Amino acid sequence: MSENGSFANCCEAGGWAVRPGWSGAGSARPSRTPRPPWVAPALSAVLIVTTAVDVVGNLLVILSVLRNRKLRNAGNLFLVSLALADLVVAFYPYPLILVAIFYDGWALGEEHCKASAFVMGLSVIGSVFNITAIAINRYCYICHSMAYHRIYRRWHTPLHICLIWLLTVVALLPNFFVGSLEYDPRIYSCTFIQTASTQYTAAVVVIHFLLPIAVVSFCYLRIWVLVLQARRKAKPESRLCLKPSDLRSFLTMFVVFVIFAICWAPLNCIGLAVAINPQEMAPQIPEGLFVTSYLLAYFNSCLNAIVYGLLNQNFRREYKRILLALWNPRHCIQDASKGSHAEGLQSPAPPIIGVQHQADAL
């Protein structure tokens, strides 16, 4: 397939980057040595598995929240937003990477390359901001329960989510001015090129990874302190009253945060090292480490739905109902009608001082 204009001068068949003056982490090997033979099959396997689990798992998350009244609350709207952030990469960037692997180079033109890299960034930054918002939500819910319903009213949460995605788009706009969205032949992907601007790379790592990690860590550390105090009854006069479901909710989101940090830390550490000293550090980054860091980052998009199913009974139960409905629609329609009638007889619990007013918050 023919490529247009300047993009055709950037990459040759086989993925070789030949743009002059483009060195380091974002470029191809100066000696044009072949890629390690494991890269294409490993990346293909990871992307195929990740895409399949990503689509099925995150659609299950979204449908579970929409179908189940116990899951339909302010906190879980952020989970739907996070699921959408994970879902977009499965529908556009990942299939395009598989096409690049098949052709041994980018064959879809510059427009698709820029769009694919933008959607990838949308997913990553959107995930970071949503995970941060979830941590703040859990922090307010447990540590400032008196003010929780004032902060997260029914119409406030959608506004918070819209603000998250607006900030995500704004955060990505500088990439078009810096020229950092390009094809990287080592990973067959159009992505963020770390050596396009070392100052911008450092800013991205600090603002979109280290700072959110610090905020989330603070929120969860404060929650852990209160949880331990409540369990040890260190403060008998405290009005904190945690139900097991509250603890499971917090634990689930804490695990999601830890997994995200583990999956994205290697790539961000590489980016920070390259930004500090691009001339010396970029050529010294082992290609196997660089590719593996991307494989780990790509794999993260399919893990959240699995965590919800493993750690949360309400999600696990709803997953089973949805899958059973797909397998045997008639049987599940009858069960759903009975279940909806039973739920309709239950009025929502009034707000209770403390943290027990959302027993099944996740």
Curated annotation (Swiss-Prot):
Cystine crosslinks: C113-C190
Gene3D superfamilies xrefs: Rhodopsin 7-helix transmembrane proteins (1.20.1070.10)
Parts of the chain that traverse the membrane: 43-63, 77-97, 116-136, 156-176, 201-221, 254-274, 288-308
Pfam families named in the record: 7tm_1
Keyword Transmembrane included in the entry's annotation: yes
GO biological process, one term: negative regulation of neuron apoptotic process
Coiled-coil annotated residue ranges, if any: none
Membrane topology: Multi-pass membrane protein
Side Cytoplasmic, residues: 64-76, 137-155, 222-253, 309-362
Residue ranges, Extracellular side: 1-42, 98-115, 177-200, 275-287
Sequence similarity: Belongs to the G-protein coupled receptor 1 family.
Protein name, entry field: Melatonin receptor type 1B
The species this protein was found in: Homo sapiens (Human)
Gene field: MTNR1B
